[in-house]
Amino acid sequence: MADFVEAARLDQVPPGTSMAVTIAGKEVAIFNVDGHIHAIDDACPHAGGSLGIGKLDGRVVTCRFHGMRIDVTNGCFPASSGFAVASYPVMVIAGTIRVAIGPLEPAS
């Protein structure tokens, strides 16, 4: 079962912004879309650019290297069905963003 690991403080990621963090050795991009926090793999699959420093427009981030666009709410590519980066469960507790990396146990 994956544990939720502290990734950042909520005040570090105001609405409309993003950041890249390392969680358990994994690079993850965190986004605040209208007060909702989302986490996906930080590396753009096209050229490995950091999505955490990409341009966020609504729920879509554009990689600054080659313009690849990814929906941060689910990791999917809006213009290409079937392609996605990993997305991760997120919880915000007492102003702390926590992200689960790895498999989760199914709810019982």
Q: Which residue stretches match the model-derived regions?
A:
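N-terminal pre-ligand scaffold of iron-sulfur
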Residues: 1-58, 71-72, 76, 84-108
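Short cysteine clusters
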Residues: 44, 63-66
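Binuclear metal-ion centers of metallo-dependent hydrolases, dominated by the metallo-beta-lactamase
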Residues: 81
